């Protein structure tokens, strides 16, 4: 199964206009685990990014993580995409360039086992459904900055998907979803909320589009199973743990050391290369 990571750096440079691009150590380590475990268990993986991201990975010697290559396709993303509100827009543009069947995978999401048996049947699948929490997934009236997009043509009762991992087995549906999500973003250049607009475009529209097109859609897990261990060791998603680590240096270091130890155990040769990176080497000591 073909998978891809993505990395669009424009949001970073909007937040940090005078900084050199960098990725935190724990994110580099989870990126390595995500790519290498995918290759071992599920197939090939590529990185779709922009030139600053590619140069950064090259400078660290990490391009080998993606056996299918590193492609700066996101250099061509339109300038009118609001990169503050739509900070993950690069994922959707990357998906628009990858034919089905494919898996869209976040760099902080790790598949420890083969998932081919879970993907037999659906046109699209994602890691889990999300509750319609009003502060995250508000009603249609919250999108006052969106003009020219048919918000009222969708079913607002359908639970959104979390797309840390998303599978697209039907190419017609993949194109419909990405076209719809990109259209929404381009109809919202003045979007003024950094959460609700993005998760609508990426996560809520996926389930809405599936409902509208009568596509077969599946959730591969659920939140209690994902974070309680009941999903039999298939998945790890770091997302909810990031802020805790940033606030607790001991937790941060312990996590990085555990990632390094797992890399050394599962990928002894590759881990030697990763351990040579200056900002990562202390965690391999």
Predicted regions and their residues:
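Catalytic core and acceptor-binding pocket of nucleotide-sugar-dependent glycosyltransferases
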Residues: 156-246
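Short glycine-/acidic-enriched loop or helix-start segments at secondary-structure transitions
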Residues: 57-59, 104, 113-116
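A conserved donor-nucleotide-binding helix/loop in the catalytic core
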Residues: 26-28, 32-34, 76-104, 112
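Conserved donor-nucleotide/metal-binding helix-loop-beta segment in metal-dependent transferases, i.e.
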Residues: 111-147
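N-terminal anchoring/stem segment of glycosyltransferases
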Residues: 1-78, 241-285
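Short acidic donor-binding/metal-coordinating loop in glycosyltransferase active sites
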Residues: 107
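Short glycine/proline-enriched coil/turn segments at helix->beta-strand junctions
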Residues: 41-44, 97-102, 120-123
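Short, flexible, basic/aromatic active-site loop/helix in glycosyltransferases
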Residues: 144-156
